Structure formats: structure tokens, C-alpha cells
């Protein structure tokens, strides 16, 4: 039975729908919350069998409003990559993965968007990534993966939505297992928020079943690519 270290950047955003999929496969996860523990980030010994980096709400990585533990998390992610441990980055976590792998991030205002992503190849996520799937982004800044990364899906503007680094590291710009309640709590948690979230929240609620349905093959692909059941 494997255990994943999950770095949480806000009280509101957690694994969401991914929790049930992991528990159903007997994959354990342990949350680390640097924002609640004086900025304490797990050390290499705390990586267990893999690393998950979650989104950050209004926190980013491109210099405007960086998450306070950015440098430590980049270093930790590099340790995971260098030792061959699987890494899953979501939102801000995907930005941290991009930097740790030799890419960069670009500044972008805090956004809350509900749209659709399209895969770039039929074999993306070991063939399990749907051709089109809901893309819910709540965050600041954008990852620019290294040239060696493979872009698995793009958003409607052609930007990376899902990318793979090496054989067992994945970045998602949106949260594939998000819930409307997560976004609602993010809006309440911070003074900074999207200007008019009502329309996108309503759309997110109507798409909840589609998100759940898309997550079934997506999670199968994540588990396979990251070798979480091996």
C-alpha cells in the first residue's frame, strides 16, 4: 500500500473528488499544511511514495504574490524528480512542477474560469485522457513547462492544460476533482477573489456530474502513469 505526501496551500482546496478514487485503490495520502504549521514543508523523508502539490487560490509563483513556501517546495519537488518518485501538480502545484523540471511560470491575474480542454494525442495519460473534458481553473499565474515536457492537453486558448514531465510526473492547470464547494470556500477564505464569480459558480454546479464522469478515466490514467498501483 503506497502513501502520497500532499502539500496543501489553502484551507479550502484539497484533493476533492480524487480522495475517493485514491481510497478505493487503497492508496493512502497525508496532508501537509505549511500555512498552518509556520511554513513547515515536508523534508525528503516525508515524501513517502510520491508527492502531490495542490492549488493555491490567489497564491502564485511568478513574483506577484508568491506562495511563501515556494522555494522550499521547488527544492522538494526536485528531490522527488531526481529520485524517481511520482509527482502530481495541480494549479499552483503544476507551476511548481514546471519550475522544478527546468521550465518557468508567467504572471497572470487571479482567474476563475470554467471551460473545456482537449487532448493532444490519443495515447495521452496512457490512453485514458478523454478527448475533451471540463477544465476548472482557480488561481494566479501560468506554468510554462520545459521543452522536454509533453503537452497532453490544451485549453481553448492553446495553453497547456495537462503536461507530463519524464515518465511519472504530471501537471494539471485545473483541478480535475474540484467541487463547487471548494471554489466557494476559496472565495470566502481570502480577501482577494474573482470580480464576479456567480455565473461561473452556476456553470460549475451544472458541470459537476460531467467532472465526476471525466475523472473516472483521468484517474485511471494518473494511477497508471504515476505507477501508483505497482
Which sequence ranges carry the predicted segments?
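Pocket-forming structural segment of enzyme catalytic cores
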Residues: 99-181
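Short N-terminal binding/cap micro-motifs at the start of the first secondary-structure element
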Residues: 12-17
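Cofactor-binding loop segments of dinucleotide-utilizing enzymes, especially the Rossmann-like FAD-
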Residues: 7-9, 34, 92, 174
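Catalytic nucleophile loop
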Residues: 79-104
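Extreme N-terminal starter segment of soluble prokaryotic enzymes
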Residues: 1-5
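Acyltransferase
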Residues: 178-230
Amino acid at each position: 500500500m503506497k502513501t502520497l505526501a500532499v502539500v496543501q496551500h489553502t484551507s479550502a482546496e484539497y484533493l476533492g473528488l480524487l480522495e475517493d478514487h485514491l481510497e478505493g485503490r487503497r492508496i493512502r495520502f497525508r496532508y501537509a499544511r505549511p500555512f498552518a504549521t509556520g511554513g513547515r514543508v515536508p523534508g525528503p523523508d516525508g515524501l513517502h511514495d510520491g508527492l502531490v502539490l495542490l492549488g493555491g487560490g490567489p497564491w502564485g509563483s511568478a513574483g506577484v504574490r508568491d506562495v511563501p513556501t515556494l522555494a522550499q517546495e521547488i527544492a522538494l519537488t526536485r528531490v522527488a524528480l531526481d529520485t524517481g518518485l511520482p509527482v502530481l501538480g495541480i494549479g499552483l502545484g503544476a507551476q511548481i512542477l514546471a519550475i522544478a523540471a527546468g521550465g518557468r511560470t508567467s504572471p497572470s491575474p487571479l482567474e476563475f474560469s470554467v471551460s473545456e480542454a482537449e487532448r493532444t494525442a490519443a495515447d495521452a495519460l496512457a490512453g485514458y485522457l478523454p478527448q475533451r473534458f471540463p477544465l476548472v481553473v482557480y488561481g494566479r499565474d501560468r506554468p510554462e513547462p520545459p521543452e522536454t515536457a509533453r503537452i497532453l492537453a490544451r485549453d481553448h486558448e492553446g495553453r497547456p492544460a495537462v503536461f507530463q514531465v519524464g515518465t511519472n510526473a504530471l501537471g494539471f492547470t485545473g483541478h480535475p476533482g474540484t467541487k463547487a464547494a471548494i471554489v466557494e470556500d476559496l472565495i470566502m477564505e481570502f480577501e482577494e477573489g474573482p470580480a464576479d464569480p456567480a455565473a461561473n459558480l452556476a456553470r460549475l454546479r451544472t458541470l459537476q456530474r460531467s467532472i465526476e464522469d471525466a475523472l473516472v478515466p483521468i484517474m485511471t490514467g494518473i494511477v497508471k502513469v504515476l505507477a501508483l498501483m505497482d
